[in-house]
Amino acid sequence: MPKNSKVVKRELDDEVIESVKDLLSNEDSADDAFKKSELIVDVPEEKDTDVVERSEVKDARPAWNSKLQYILAQVGFSVGLGNVWRFPYLCQKNGGGAYLLPYLILLLVIGIPLFFLELSVGQRIRRGSIGVWNYISPQLGGIGFASCVVCFFVALYYNVIIGWSLFYFSQSFQQPLPWDQCPLVKNASHTFVEPECEKSSATTYYWYREALNISTSISESGGLNWKMTICLLAAWVVVCLAMIKGIQSSGKIMYFSSLFPYVVLICFLIRALLLNGSVDGIRHMFTPELEIMLEPKVWREAAAQVFFALGLGFGGVIAFSSYNKRDNNCHFDAVLVSFINFFTSILATLVVFAVLGFKANVINEKCIAENSEMIIKLVKMGNISQDIIPHHINFSAITAEDYDLIYDIIQKVKEEEFPALHLNACQIEDELNKAVQGTGLAFIAFTEAMTHFPASPFWSVMFFLMLVNLGLGSMFGTIEGIITPVVDTFKVRKEILTVICCLLAFCIGLIFVQRSGNYFVTMFDDYSATLPLLIVVILENIAVSFVYGIDKFMEDLKDMLGFTPNRYYYYMWKYISPLMLLSLLIASIVNMGLSPPGYNAWMEDKASEKFLSYPTWGMVICISLMVLAILPIPVVFIIRRCNLIDDSSGNLASVTYKRGRVLKEPVNLEGDDASLIHGKISSEMSSPNFGKNIYRKQSGSPTLDTAPNGRYGIGYLMADMPDMPESDL
């Protein structure tokens, strides 16, 4: 193309090259210039194709070795610790079996459509979260940065939980288990049971004192817990080694880390069903309380669980799907992974309540034995008449039914004096109604249940190895949500970035392995992700449905999948999902405002938990976590809206596209026109120096409403987009 070629008007079906700097500018003057300017380029179609083909051969983006590996990676990321220790708690708390109906409805309304959306944009644009949202709308490019920040915050404390699991795993190779009984304290005169343990339980004591060595408040740091520091280091080393070689390495690990938890859950379920009382737990779990289902709180908690169970907004879903082939059926993947996640939660719920049913039965038998002895003592002391005890009852082999009968009789006969007798009802339902979740379920309730298992060390090893694998699967996706977009955007070496990221996270994570570290884990879990992720996903939905255009997006899906997705998704993305997400955001803000910010501190002298409010500096950290997570969104918007950064200097808003694919930036636009048109890429293009950029318009494509900026969308770019090599992104 001659250097002195002039800009003239042509018909819409002519071949055109446009400047991305003009297209990405949101100022009216730039838009007017775009509307009036087109460059005449007469280029044979086959030569342009040669450019793409040769470039793709030279620079290929890493890809999954197989479809199974990819599915396992997505399953490993979405199926995490929350499926085991959060979903069963919510199910029990919110009406048992009745909770499954609102959860399933919201999975169809929010979960699958938004999961499908993230898979689609990642696979179509083939970049991480930063590149995807910057590509769709530069002014909303901060969404990707916000996702990275949230991923980093979550990774900080999530790996601490993996460290805890590693500690318990390492301590499980003992018979008996170290948390089976309370330790004895010896002094010069006599031996006695540790008072803190005697007031609570052996498993509770082991968790708070032996494992965490916890302080009494968040203000009392107490120094580092060296045992947990080593475990945290080991967890980060495992994550770093798995991620450092990219998806080829982490993908292979997924074969074990994603499948092993299912083996353990099935083994636990079979073993638990053979134990006495397991059926009571499952029956209690799925006894529906339909009246609870109508409460708004149930729907809010179900929506939040659906939202976080699938890992929406983290960027890991987008990062994993960006390594797929362009024609992969991501709709099938979205439905498959979503229902695998759902049925995993059901399986985990069956296991949890079968085990807790057994535990409740053991505790109930112990309660009956202790209270029977107390009744015998009261009879001998004359406080209870022997005549009111039925003659057929044998206290040496008393059943639960016999004890219930005696308890009711004594309660009626000694109505006024009954409270002073200190007898317990010993009901299995009372024990099952003690809802536990999170660390309380995994490290206290479940560990206590396993002490009553035959061959308890074996089951303990299996259980905590399962937790480690569940955690690692989610961690791989979380770290991928940081690494992939940064590598795609800034062209740094993945190995170096991975090591730096893991090393930095370990250093910051030392605050979680202080004696007060558990309180910081609670703080980060409550404030670093919930609201920021909701805002991120709402903006993702808006960016695709309204900024880019839902109609063009549906056309892109048709081109990519080979069929038009059901119209159901059109209405979900455009109307229902945004309204549901906005309602969930408002409800979460209201709930956060009504709930006093604080944490449950362990009181050593009382051997019980006590709710404490965060100190002033703690509140500052809570607010800072939320602000820092969403801060990139308005910052990037203002920078791009006000043109505070010169696109020619090489920033994220300036990217070169050609026939729907990203090209390396020519150093000199005019000097490189001829080589680009004739199918040659100069050696100078290897440097991603973003400056003047060019577009080539396909014949027959629409005009302004298909331009590649936030206002006009990117329809024609995505309509014929070949696989984009990572080096070209």
Curated annotation (Swiss-Prot):
Membrane topology: Multi-pass membrane protein
Enzymatic reactions: L-leucine(in) + Na(+)(in) = L-leucine(out) + Na(+)(out); L-isoleucine(in) + Na(+)(in) = L-isoleucine(out) + Na(+)(out); L-methionine(in) + Na(+)(in) = L-methionine(out) + Na(+)(out); L-proline(in) + Na(+)(in) = L-proline(out) + Na(+)(out)
Family in the record: Belongs to the sodium:neurotransmitter symporter (SNF) (TC 2.A.22) family. SLC6A15 subfamily.
Major subcellular location class: membrane
Name of the protein in question: Sodium-dependent neutral amino acid transporter B(0)AT2
SUPFAM superfamilies per UniProt: SNF-like (SSF161070)
InterPro entries linked: B(0)AT2 (IPR042934), Na/ntran_symport (IPR000175), Neutral_aa_SLC6 (IPR002438), SNS_sf (IPR037272)
Transport as UniProt keyword: yes
Record topological domains on the Extracellular side: 163-225, 357-452
Gene: SLC6A15
Annotated keywords: Amino-acid transport, Glycoprotein, Ion transport, Membrane, Neurotransmitter transport, Phosphoprotein, Sodium, Sodium transport, Symport, Transmembrane, Transmembrane helix, Transport
Glycosylation: residue positions: N187, N213, N383, N394
Entry superkingdom: Eukaryota
